[in-house]
Every structure is written in C-alpha cells, then in structure tokens.
Amino acid sequence: PEMSRGLGDVYKRQEWYDSAEGLDDLALDYRIKSVQSAILKYKRYYPDHQARKVFDDLLGFRSLCDNYEEVLQLKKIDKFRIADMTNGKANDDGYRGIHVYFQLDGKHYPIEIQYNTYYDRQFNNWLHKYVYKKEYDNSVGCYLRKRYESAKILSEKEFKEELDHVLFDSETYR
C-alpha cells in the first residue's frame, strides 16, 4: 500500500512536470523509476530500511556538468545530501557521478539529481544499456571502465565488443 501510494504521487508529479511551462529550457532529463525497478529495490532493502529511504530516487533528474567541483559545493547547503561516486560506488561497478538528494521536509518525497560529466555520462549510458540489471559481476563494469579510461573503448560499438569478449572468455562474469 505504501509503495502504491508513493508511485501514484510520483506519477502526479510527472504529469505536472510534463505540462509545466519553461521547464523545457532547463538542461535536465528526468525519469520515473519503473514499477519493476521499484519492486526489485523494495524487495532488496525492505524491511531492513524504511520504505521512504528505499524510495529516495523514485523521481530523478539527470544533468550534465563540466566537472564535479561545483556540484560538490552543494554539500554546504542544509537540505542537500550528496552521494559522491566520482571514484566509484562502495561496491564499484564502473559507474561515476554525483547524486544530489533534496527533501523539503519529512512530508515530501526526496528528489534525486544525478550529475555526470559528458565523459562519464557516455560510459554510464553504455553500462546502463548493456550491463545494469544483468547478473554480471561488478568487476565487468570495473574492467570496462579501465578500458574506457585508457582510451581502448571510444565508441558504443567498441564497448559492446569488449563486453562480449569479457563475457565469452570468462565464466567468472556470468
């Protein structure tokens, strides 16, 4: 019930966002977490975490930045919580970025804004398309990230070829 109510609230916000004037001019993309993703996340974390903590990213925005230094300055503002993944997550999977969470108060859902440099966004998009939510070990994403950072992967085609090569050559990654 709590999850259904939360998703309903988020879809109302999506309708508002889609109809609001002037927002098209902002350099933001948004997404609403799919019901499937929300259920998977709920099952993974509940009951160990409160539902509102599990769903802190139902409504998310994505924005690009030239570098992460200005975004990190948001730490100084009271209502912002920063998740700095510029050097990887605690359980690194190759993703890089900064997630900023804003919540007006406990009665409102938080809003997540994901910031990436152009360089990281390109790689993160490929990770999301070909690796994310698959049963691959996180070391697959880390290996691909190293290849990307050493300029061995310069295109989506090369990303896919490297991924296929890694998966074909090693049972470890399956």
Q: What is each stretch, according to the model?
A:
Residues S4, G22-L23, Q36, Y132, ...:
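A generic structural signal for solvent-exposed, polar alpha-helical segments
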Residues V166-R174:
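Subset of Sec-pathway N-terminal targeting signals
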Residues R52-L59, L64-E161:
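Long beta-strand-rich cores associated with HINT superfamily self-processing modules
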Residues K12-D56:
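Short, compositionally biased low-complexity segments enriched in polar/charged residues
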